[in-house]
């Protein structure tokens, strides 16, 4: 509680009131509350508007007023003005209303300065002149009242006063609430904001000063209130009044309110600028054209009354609706502009045609076209978008544009814009160039593997650059999996070459269009770069695509479920990327193998012996179409080929170097069993092998061991065995069966019965069971073609050079023990050329009696011909006896020469 002053008991005021009413001490405390209420309110308002001097104590500290729990610096300013309220009381000497006016003092303005106020529209008004005109007096006003505060102690009620001593603490607490409200309100009204703006901007000449004055309600009120006089010429209220509240006391109700001017945006301007602005505003209407004067007379009059004395009257009321960009700029849009920052897709979608198009295409211009066999809705959207778009040759500087890369102020999809004339000659159908240029990150295009093979569309007419019909519009967006190299296409379609797949992030036309759209149906037509026809055609189709009202899945407002679904789909396609790459590479290599092996042929049993026209691919079964999804198909012998049966009972690993003699001689013995049931098997001579089961050397192609049931290829031809399919087999044509039989019959005639080496007549250490089927098939196929000819397999021994089943003897030492070679190399070459055909015939290469057909389609020599020839000679020379070696070599050379001459015939 504040410190109340002591009441003088000798004062004669208290007589009857003391006997029947409140005590003298309670009355004194009530008077102190009313006095400090007025003075404290005045100090708060004055301190917020003007600077007040501070009173210091004897100790040198500031004297602080702590009434109503708000600390304010005590001041001697306005002490005389506030003397009345310092000496007032609640019941006797009642105070008059306290009025505090805050005004703007303009007495320091020079003759060249004017106090102006700026309205919300930016117009300047001369404040002092407006106030003088409204008051009707010519006295030079030098102030503008900003606000007025009023604090009043109203009359006490008519009942007899009661003892209120016990209610004083409650009254004091109510006053605390009021002063908190007053302190806040004093810093929220416009006058305080204007005072703060003056302090920030500064006034070097002190031309504008805010002052306050204190008046009482007893003064004669003015005939015209300066606070309520309008300065701005508008119909809005000039002032506003805010009631802070009323505090009930035993002495009466304390009422407080504030009335303030709504517009306080005052400033000082040069008087000449105000005068010239006033003249310019008046001249603006004097020079209006006469034709427009009649129609706009009423509007001009009202505007003139509003903006007298200032230039920028209606400039802010009009909206700038001119074109955003001028002719000749990139991607021009005309008419009402779309909102700034909107995407180019929204701007294009907002285009609409105007009433008619007066332009016509020139004679030499490129033709435009309409889509063929389109629906009614798509044709309607095509015509509307084609007329609205003014095409240009503007290429985007970047390879892929984003969805918000073009600033524009367009309306949205529901609204439309007028189009510019001259857009008809350039509106055309689809092409692939501009779509690849205009595609965003969502329309980048899939690689050929994900798109699938091109399918011929029913509503597409492939055209060249000079033809009129164009393909139908694209039905959907491409996927965004891009930056991948081109793959060859299958299914009978032409190959689409992606010429710019290697560039950084840019995808070519062929990889960004859809398979069935027919955009690339005429690849290479009008192949000049920068073709105007392709540019204009595809721009029109791009507009059609935007007009199809299809919402991308990424922009569908379907909530969290659609986002998860889209994320799952994108993740699935991203995980399929590597597998599709591998599949495409495999398909590409398979197609190359199909072309390389398509010329390798095989004689069927039903075809005449000398005719080799029927060919069967080595990479697929007979009658099976070549499929792009079966790369590297192994050549499995077909059961249709002469009833051949593959045996897989006892596979063994053999190599080109470890071919044994017994594999060929077993065929001879098995043929004896199949043809002569009563004939016993003869001993097959072979050389002893200390390292009989040789492991196959790793192949240069597969780098792995390959298990074969038997070895029946090509006899002693060391370089014609185990051909890989990937090396190709289309450079040689196999001999016919008749040729092979003639060679075999001639070899029987010239064969010497004593030519066998006795050292070779040793029993074979092992005879494979799988050779039985092979020899039986060989003999049966030979007898079917020529029954008169003796069996090719019935030879006296493998030592003869003429025998097609001549064993490869030297298989003991491997590669490291080959001795030096002797003998005639030319005879070996003749032997090679003459014996190759018969060995193929006897070995069952072309008799369709193979057990395993892993190498049956390869006839061209390997890359290691000469090394294999030398290796075969060295292997034979190891096992042959020293004495009979030269004789047998001579016999071999002679017989080989004779066989070579017979073969040449």
Swiss-Prot record:
Residues 1-22, 295-377, 398-425, 444-535, 554-704, 747-850, 871-905 are annotated as: Disordered. GO terms for cellular component: Atg1/ULK1 kinase complex; autophagosome; cytosol; phagophore assembly site. Residues 659-675, 871-883 have a biased composition (Basic and acidic residues). The keyword Transport applies. The keyword Ion transport does not apply. Residues 323-334, 769-782 have a biased composition (Polar residues). Keywords: Autophagy, Cytoplasm, Protein transport, Transport. Its main location: cytoplasm. Pfam families: ATG13. Activates the atg1 kinase in a nutritional condition dependent manner through the TOR pathway, leading to autophagy. Also involved in cytoplasm to vacuole transport (Cvt) and more specifically in Cvt vesicle formation. Seems to play a role in the switching machinery regulating the conversion between the Cvt pathway and autophagy. Finally, atg13 is also required for glycogen storage during stationary phase. Belongs to the ATG13 family. Fungi subfamily. This is Autophagy-related protein 13. It comes from Sclerotinia sclerotiorum (strain ATCC 18683 / 1980 / Ss-1) (White mold). The gene is atg13.
């Amino acid at each position: 509680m504040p410190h109340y002053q002591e009441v003088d008991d000798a004062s004669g005021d208290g007589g009857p009131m003391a006997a029947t009413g409140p005590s003298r001490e309670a009355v004194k405390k009530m008077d102190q509350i009313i006095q400090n209420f007025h003075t404290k309110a005045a100090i708060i308002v004055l301190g917020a508007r003007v600077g007040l001097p501070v009173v210091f104590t004897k100790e040198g500290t500031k004297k602080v007023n702590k009434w109503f729990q708000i600390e304010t610096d005590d001041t001697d300013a306005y002490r005389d003005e506030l003397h009345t309220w310092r000496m007032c009381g609640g019941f006797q000497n009642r105070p008059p209303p306290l009025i505090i006016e805050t005004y703007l003092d303009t007495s320091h303005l020079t003759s060249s300065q004017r106090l102006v106020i700026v309205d919300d529209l930016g117009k300047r008004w001369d404040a002092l002149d407006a106030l003088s005109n409204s008051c009707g007096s010519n006295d030079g006003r030098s102030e503008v009242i900003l606000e007025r505060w009023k604090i009043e102690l109203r009359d006490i009620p008519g009942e007899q006063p009661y003892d209120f001593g016990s209610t004083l603490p409650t009254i004091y607490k109510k006053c605390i609430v009021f002063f908190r409200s007053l302190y806040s309100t004093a810093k929220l009204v416009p006058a305080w904001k204007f005072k703060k703006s003056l302090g920030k901007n500064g006034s070097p000449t002190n031309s504008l000063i805010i002052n306050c004055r204190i008046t009482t309600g007893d003064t004669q009120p003015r005939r015209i209130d300066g606070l309520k006089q309008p300065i701005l010429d508008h119909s809005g209220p000039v002032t506003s009044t805010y009631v802070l509240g009323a505090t009930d006391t035993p002495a009466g109700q304390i009422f407080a309110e504030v009335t303030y001017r709504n517009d306080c945006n005052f400033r000082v301007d040069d008087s000449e600028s105000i005068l010239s602005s006033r003249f310019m505003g008046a001249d603006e209407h004097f020079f209006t054209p006469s034709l427009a004067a009649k129609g706009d007379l009423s509007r001009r009059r009202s505007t003139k009354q509003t903006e007298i004395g200032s230039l920028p009257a209606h400039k802010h009321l009009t909206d700038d609706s001119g074109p955003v960009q001028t002719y000749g700029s990139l991607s021009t849009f005309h008419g009402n502009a779309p909102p700034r920052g909107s995407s180019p897709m929204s701007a294009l979608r907002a285009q609409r045609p105007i009433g008619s198009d007066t332009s016509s295409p020139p004679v030499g211009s490129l033709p435009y076209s309409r889509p063929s066999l389109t629906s009614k809705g798509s044709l309607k959207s095509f015509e509307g978008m084609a007329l609205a778009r003014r095409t240009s040759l503007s290429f985007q500087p970047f390879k892929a544009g984003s969805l918000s890369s073009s600033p524009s102020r367009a309306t949205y999809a529901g609204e439309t814009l007028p189009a510019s004339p001259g857009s008809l000659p350039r509106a055309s159908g689809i092409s692939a160039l501009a779509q690849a240029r205009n595609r965003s990150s969502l329309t980048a295009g899939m690689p050929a593997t994900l798109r699938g093979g091109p399918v011929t569309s029913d509503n597409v007419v492939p055209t060249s650059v000079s033809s009129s019909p164009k393909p139908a519009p694209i039905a959907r967006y491409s996927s965004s999996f891009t930056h991948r190299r081109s793959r060859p296409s299958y299914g009978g379609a032409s190959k689409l070459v992606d010429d710019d797949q290697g560039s950084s992030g840019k995808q070519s036309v062929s990889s960004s269009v859809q398979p069935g759209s027919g955009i690339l149906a005429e690849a290479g037509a009008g192949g000049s770069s920068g073709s105007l026809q392709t540019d204009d055609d595809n721009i029109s189709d791009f507009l059609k695509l935007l007009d199809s009202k299809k919402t991308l899945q990424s922009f569908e407002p379907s909530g969290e479920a659609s986002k998860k679904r889209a994320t799952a789909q994108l993740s699935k396609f991203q995980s399929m990327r590597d597998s599709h790459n591998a599949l495409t590479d495999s398909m590409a290599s398979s197609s190359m193998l199909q072309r390389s092996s398509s010329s390798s042929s095989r004689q069927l049993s039903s075809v005449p012996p000398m005719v080799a026209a029927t060919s069967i691919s080595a990479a697929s079964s007979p009658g099976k179409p070549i499929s792009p999804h079966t790369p590297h198909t192994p050549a499995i012998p077909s059961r249709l080929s002469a009833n051949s049966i593959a045996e897989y009972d006892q596979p063994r690993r053999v190599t080109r170097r470890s071919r044994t003699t017994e594999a060929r001689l077993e065929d001879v013995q098995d043929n004896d069993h199949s043809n002569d049931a009563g004939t016993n098997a003869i001993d097959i001579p072979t050389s002893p092998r200390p390292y009989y089961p040789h492991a196959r050397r790793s192949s240069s192609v597969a780098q792995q061991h390959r298990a074969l049931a038997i070895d029946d290829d090509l006899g002693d031809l060391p370089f014609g065995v185990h051909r890989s399919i990937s090396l190709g087999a289309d450079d040689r044509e196999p001999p016919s069966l008749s040729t092979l039989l003639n060679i075999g019959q001639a070899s029987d005639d010239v064969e010497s019965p004593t030519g066998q080496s006795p050292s070779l007549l040793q029993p074979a250490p092992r005879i494979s069971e799988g050779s039985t089927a092979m020899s039986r098939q060989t003999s049966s196929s030979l007898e079917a073609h020529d029954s008169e000819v003796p069996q090719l397999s019935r030879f006296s021994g493998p030592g003869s050079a003429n025998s097609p089943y001549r064993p490869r003897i030297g298989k003991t030492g491997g590669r490291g023990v080959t001795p030096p070679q002797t003998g005639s190399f030319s005879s070996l070459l003749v032997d090679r050329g003459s014996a190759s055909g018969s060995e193929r015939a006897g070995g069952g290469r072309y008799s369709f009696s193979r057990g395993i057909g892993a190498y049956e389609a390869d006839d061209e020599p390997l890359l290691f011909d000469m090394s294999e020839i030398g290796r075969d000679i060295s292997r034979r020379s190891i096992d042959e006896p020293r004495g009979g070696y030269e004789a047998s070599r001579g016999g071999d050379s002679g017989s080989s020469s004779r066989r070579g001459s017979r073969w040449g015939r």
